[in-house]
Amino acid sequence: MSNSEPTRALSDRSPGERGANQPRETAKREIEREATTTVNRGDAERTVVHFMRHGEVHNPEGILYGRLPGYRLSDRGEQQAKLVAEFLAGRDVVHVVASPLQRAQQTAEPIGATFQVDVATDERLIESENRFEGLKVSVGDGALSSPKHWPKLWNPLRPSWGEPYLQIAHRMLGAAQRARAAAAGHEAVCVSHQLPIWTLRRFLEGKPMWHDPRRRQCSLASLTSLVFRGEELVRIAYVEPAGATDPKVTGA
């Protein structure tokens, strides 16, 4: 797998330098350039798999909802999904797949409609398991301030409070390979969640999978795009068609 300079043009920026000030047309040109720099357009061996994070969720309680049922997109989240569908219009998307959770399925709907394809479901795209699910985890007034929860935090490298990073990376890599095969020579969109997408990216870039959650580059409705030549990953691109969001927002 070639991974030299996989994110140079877009992804080496800090969260404060990107997103909100990135015009949508500029972002569209950047991802177009990133997705075609290494391989020529029309190349039958070229496949792009876009990993999209779902849109904003209606979460007035501010809890970490994880895999809990019933968490739908907010009005803003629905608009974000439509913006990404418009952003991708005109590209060669032939396969759309989503996590089974409601917010991911809702995010995928306008994209499937834009390209007139049915939205498939892949369990491997689901949100990561988390032992703080259903609790508030904001700094100062959340579950993290309670001593009874501290034993869950003993190993941040695994992590001890949830699904192992390596397990997340392996299942997401499996989802990526299935999408690549389904869209061979074209493009696919996989709608998933922040931690699974970010873990996959760090795994592919050969970086440690443990990290500071405040530094994740995976905004709501963002696209992390894997460019393949055949089975070889040749580039990773990142854009925020719906603008930047704060990675510290609970349950986003």
How would you label these PLM feature ranges?
Residues 24, 36-38, 43-44, 83-150:
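Phosphate-coordination/substrate-recognition cap region in phosphate-metabolizing enzymes
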Residues 46-54:
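Short, hydrophobic/glycine-enriched beta-strand segments
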Residues 49, 186-194:
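Generic beta-sheet signal
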Residues 56-106, 111, 161-173:
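Loop-to-helix element that buttresses phosphate recognition and phosphoryl-transfer chemistry
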Residues 90-92, 179-186:
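Glycine-rich phosphate-binding loop signature in dinucleotide/nucleotide-binding domains
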Residues 146-167:
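Short glycine/proline- and acidic residue-enriched helix-loop micro-motifs
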Residues 207-234:
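Domain-level recognition of soluble alpha/beta enzyme cores
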Residues 239-252:
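Acidic, His/Gly-rich catalytic cores of divalent-metal-dependent hydrolytic chemistry
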